[in-house]
Amino acid sequence: MALLEICCYSMECALTAQQNGADRVELCAAPKEGGLTPSLGVLKSVRQRVTIPVHPIIRPRGGDFCYSDGEFAAILEDVRTVRELGFPGLVTGVLEVDGNVDMPRMEKIMAAAGPLAVTFHRAFDMCANPLNTLNNLTELGITRVLTSGQKSDALQGLSKIMELIAHRDAPIIMAGAGVRAENLHHFLDAGVLEVHSSAGAWQASPMRYRNQGLSMSSDAHADEYLRYVVDGAAVAEMKGIIERHQAK
């Protein structure tokens, strides 16, 4: 049966995902940045309360995946922290300036991760040559690759995803970006074994007093009284679709 991973941005969201049938959680901070390394407090809280596998993302900032020496040092420290806390896996990725996998740095990450399952995230979708990159990741011992098939969403990239899945000895290929209940059957029918979804919704803040003339964001037009949360009903719906597909 296909595995359902839900992207979560808080302990509460991780619990919601677990309660509604998620098989695994990718734990992040900063949804508007596409996911950054969670704080130590969030990591510890989730480790204590969530019982399904949780893989934290290790990404020090938004933007591209070519990092300074200081940023890479922080990545290694975060990898060691996640390992010490007892998480079963993590999610990360580093590229060179030419769009290829930074093999020396990824080798250091793999050594620091030790027995943890390492997912190479959507840095893969920004690489210059996906098949060469897949060979590199196979050589590194990466467990899985999260990809949209180098398109803006995974449904558009499904043909490339299937090409990657067919690649001999490849890591697990997990489809992600725009995967939701209404298009999930396309991935299941194609034989995708792992899918990644935010199953998210924007929820109004409980704040009653609101200073509308002031923003804490660099985007002056951002609505800071909305919070991104996991929609438990959406997770349950996707899990039900997977189970019914398996029963066919």
Curated annotation (Swiss-Prot):
Gene3D superfamilies: Copper homeostasis (CutC) domain
InterPro entries: CutC-like (IPR005627), CutC-like_dom_sf (IPR036822)
Assigned keywords, A-Z: Cytoplasm
Subunit structure as annotated in this protein's UniProt entry: Homodimer.
Listed PANTHER family: COPPER HOMEOSTASIS PROTEIN CUTC (PTHR12598), COPPER HOMEOSTASIS PROTEIN CUTC HOMOLOG (PTHR12598:SF0)
Similarity section: Belongs to the CutC family.
Protein name as annotated: PF03932 family protein CutC
Originating organism: Escherichia coli O1:K1 / APEC
Lineage of the organism: Bacteria, Pseudomonadati, Pseudomonadota, Gammaproteobacteria, Enterobacterales
Gene of this entry: cutC
